[in-house]
Amino acid sequence: MKWRNDAGLAGNSVVVTGAGGGIGSAVARGFAEAGSKVLLVDIPSAPLNDVLKTLTGTGHQILPCDLSDLKGHVNIFEKAAEAAEVVALAHCAAVLRRRATVDDVTEEDWDLQIDVNMKATFFLNRTAHAHFKKNGTKGSIVNFSSQGWWTGGFGGSVVYAGSKGGVVSMTKGLARSFAPDGIRVNAVSPGGVDTSMMTGNQTPEQLASFVSMIPMGRLATPEEMVGPVIFLASQASSFVTGTVANVSGGQLMY
């Protein structure tokens, strides 16, 4: 699928976090097809070089980075700016440590998911805003939530769901704060997506039960997350901010 390259993305830099994973790597390829120069960001163990080889175009870079280490956030945008003006952040990075009942959740489960999914989101968004404002860029931030923010999570994912609810609230609050500077903040809220996070944390029976609740009768592919991200990151959505795009195959209707 080819994305239009006339909506402010072609020739400019974008940052994609979680770029070594299923959704993040698909989003990175979508931006590359739109003509962007992509900075791939993920934890050091992620296969960033493998993803880099799949991108069309030139000027792409990788940056291994633990987003829970806030000191590294400024380096992300400085690195991306080496290639071209940074116009967008697609923050796809997230972690579901494990599925656990409420009684089985440990402090380590809580801390990791809140640190990565909420704390890193807030501070990375703030750093993106500072970079955009300093450079006079009307940039766009696209965060990733989950339908769990609305449902409370399925199958032992209450902490993950809570952290994604925080992403929705912060997206709205940050959108309001950044709007006077012309900087937009939106979120994509996927339902079930065919990635290791989804399929690797459930039994076949649990997965079949989950899929049975999706009106479209299947999981999404990672590539089906790309269109909403490209739209929200580009000037095609220049008057859209503070919104949450529900991409769940009809499972979540509100």
Predicted feature residues:
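Short C-terminal tail/terminal secondary-structure segment
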Residues: 1-5, 99, 212, 230, ...
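Canonical Rossmann dinucleotide-binding motif of NAD(H)/NADP(H)-dependent dehydrogenases/reductases
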Residues: 3, 7-39
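Active-site loop of short-chain dehydrogenase/reductase
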Residues: 12, 85-87, 132-146, 180-183, ...
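Substrate-binding pocket helix/loop in short-chain dehydrogenase/reductase
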Residues: 100-102, 106-114, 206, 210
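Alpha-helical segment proximal to the catalytic Tyr-Lys
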Residues: 130, 176-180, 238
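Catalytic loop of short-chain dehydrogenase/reductase
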Residues: 142-166, 171-172, 176-180
